[in-house]
Amino acid sequence: MLVVRADYKKYPVPVLEKMRIDEDEFYNKYDACVVVQTCNRIEAYFDTEINSNVDGILKDFQGFDVLKGKNATFHFLKVSCGMDSMILGENQILGQIKTSFQKARELKKTSRYLDSLFLKAIHVGQRARTETKINEGGVSIGSAAVELAEKNFGLANRNVLLIGAGEMGTLVAKALIEKHIKAVIVANRTYERAETLAKELKGMAVHFDKLKEAINFSDVIICATSSPHHILEKKDLIDVGNKIIIDIANPRDVDDSVRELENIELYAIDDLRHISDKNLQSRIEEIPAVEKIIDEEYEVLMKQIEKINVEEVLKEFNNYIEEIRVKELEKAIKLSKTKNPEEIMENFSKAFAKRITHDFVSYSINTSKEDLMNSAWWKNGK
C-alpha cells in the first residue's frame, strides 16, 4: 500500500485548502484508491498491486508526505482511532473514513485489499472507542470551537449564531447545549434542517436570506457549513459591530480578508489546537491500550491479506490450467476423427502434463531457491 498525506501538523489550513484533491478528477484517473479529506487532513490510499506506477503517483502529489507498506497500514489504523487527530480521540474522523470508503466503493474504485484495510480500520476505531476512554468527553472540532469561545470570551448571557446545520453544525450544537447561553440562532440554506437543530437547542431558526439580521443580533458566530465557497466576506461584516467569529468549516466559510476589520475577531481551525482540554491527560493515558488493540488487529489484518494473496494465486493458477486444458482439448477433438479414443486420451494427458512441466521448468531456471519454495502456484493443492 501507498499513502500520500498532508495534514495540520505540517501545513496551516489555508495551505491545505490549496492542496485539496479534486475527487472527481482523482477517481477518473486512478483505480484501487480511496481519498479521505477532512478540515485538517488530506490523504489518498493506493493499492500498489494495481497502481504499479508509483513514480507517477508521487509526481502527481509533490509536497505530500509518503508512507508505504507496514508504516502506511499502522498510520491508517491510528488515524481511525483519532490518535493522529488535532484533538486526540475525536469521534468525527471515524464517520469521515466510513463516508470516504462508501463513496469509493460506490464508484467501484476499491480493491479486495483496500476493502479489507478500510473495514479493519473502521472496526479498530470502534474497538478503541468502546474498550478504552480515548474519546472521553465526546471531543470534536465542534466542541473545541465552543470551548475556545467560552474560554476567551465567555458564553454566559451571549447570543450565539450557528451557521450550518450539517454534521459539523450538529457537533457544535451538542457542545452548546451544556452552556448557559442567552439565545441561540441557527441559520442554514435548508431551513427545515436549521429548524430541527434549533429545537434541540431551544433556540430559533432563520432563513438564509435573513443572515445579516441574525449576525447583527449575535455576539458570537460559529460557521460550520459544507459550502464550497465563502459565505461571509469583508463587505458583509463592516457595519455589524464587534463580533467573534469561529470558522470551522471545510473549506472555510469566512474570507481571510475579514481579519483586516477591527470590529471582528476571526478564529479558524488552526487556532483550536491550543485550546486546553480538561480530559486530555486521561485520554493520553489511554494511548497504550489503543496501541495494543492496533497491534492485535494488525496481525489479524495481515492474515486476511495473506489469505487474499493465496486466493489470487489460486485463481491465476486455475485460469492457467483452464487455458491449457482448452487448447489441448481442441487438439484432441480434431484428432478424434482419425485415431482411436484410448490413444487420444493418452496423448491428451501427456500433452497436458508436459505443458505444465515445461512452464514450471522455464519459471524455475531463473528463480532463487527461496523464491521457488515460496511459490505455491505449481504445487497443485499440496
From Swiss-Prot:
One matching Pfam family: GlutR_dimer
Alphabetized InterPro entries for the sequence: 4pyrrol_synth_GluRdtase (IPR000343), 4pyrrol_synth_GluRdtase_dimer (IPR015896), 4pyrrol_synth_GluRdtase_N (IPR015895), GluRdtase_CS (IPR018214), GluRdtase_dimer_dom_sf (IPR036453), GluRdtase_N_sf (IPR036343), NAD(P)-bd_dom_sf (IPR036291), Shikm_DH/Glu-tRNA_Rdtase (IPR006151)
GO MF annotations, alphabetized: glutamyl-tRNA reductase activity; NADP binding
Domain of life: Archaea
Secretion signal, residue range per the UniProt entry: none
E.C. no: 1.2.1.70
Marked site positions, Important for activity: H75
Function: Catalyzes the NADPH-dependent reduction of glutamyl-tRNA(Glu) to glutamate 1-semialdehyde (GSA).
Protein name per UniProt: Glutamyl-tRNA reductase
Source organism: Methanococcus maripaludis (strain C5 / ATCC BAA-1333)
Biological classification of the source: Archaea, Methanobacteriati, Methanobacteriota, Methanomada group, Methanococci
